[in-house]
């Protein structure tokens, strides 16, 4: 069994919302609802003050974490929420009755009930694209090249992002070019890798936030 996930470099993310727009376009997400949203964290005020580049602020893309032990799957009374072989958490809309139990169980608030169809919806990690060998839309269209997709069972170093801007060829050819995460971002260490708070669900997505980035040696992870 695999565990597909997304790694986001928060030192690169600019909060441009390209991931949100790409997700909506690829998945037909209704107006007013989001499968991924970008949250601004900070700026954090210091008693002693501070000046650039010690600004202590970052953007945090939030989506389904495709947890290893998802509580939303456990509480679903009809078995509509399922953990798949590739590690993603999906919703069988034919089985969903819109009871909202999974919404209450999710610690990250990334599910909602579609008012038109009365079924729960959330990020699918673009399963329709991944099955064709493509990257999730939020990864492929990230303007800052801050997002990477892969299988945690193969290690984070195996995660890949979209083509480099200098890649030649047609759009389709460019989309076929991938770059490994460590070849695309500033160096990071194990203690620069963070996850959202674990309430027993074991989230799968990772976020890079460097404590040693430039002169910002006292940067802290805040959620």
Features from the language model and the residues they span:
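Non-ligating segments of multi-cofactor redox enzymes
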Residues: 1-223
């Amino acid at each position: 069994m695999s565990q597909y996930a997304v790694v986001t470099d928060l030192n690169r993310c600019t909060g441009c919302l390209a991931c949100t727009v790409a997700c909506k376009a690829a998945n037909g997400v209704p107006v007013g609802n989001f499968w991924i949203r970008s949250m601004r964290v900070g700026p954090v005020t210091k008693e002693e003050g501070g000046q650039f580049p010690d600004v202590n602020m970052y953007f945090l893309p939030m989506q389904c974490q495709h947890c290893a032990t998802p509580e939303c799957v456990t509480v679903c009374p009809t078995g509509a929420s399922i953990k798949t072989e590739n590690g993603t958490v999906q919703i069988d809309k034919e089985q969903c009755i819109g009871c909202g139990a999974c919404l209450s169980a999710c610690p990250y608030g990334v599910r909602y009930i579609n008012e038109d169809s009365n079924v729960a919806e959330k990020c699918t990690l673009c399963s329709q694209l991944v099955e064709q060998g493509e990257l999730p839309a939020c990864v492929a269209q990230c303007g800052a090249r801050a997002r990477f997709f892969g299988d945690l069972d193969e290690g984070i170093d195996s995660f890949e992002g979209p083509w480099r801007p200098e890649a030649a060829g047609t759009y389709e050819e460019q989309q076929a070019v991938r770059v490994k995460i460590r070849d695309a971002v500033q160096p990071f260490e194990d203690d620069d890798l963070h996850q959202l708070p674990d309430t027993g669900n074991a989230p799968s997505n990772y976020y890079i936030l460097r404590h040693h980035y430039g002169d910002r040696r006292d940067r802290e992870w805040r959620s």
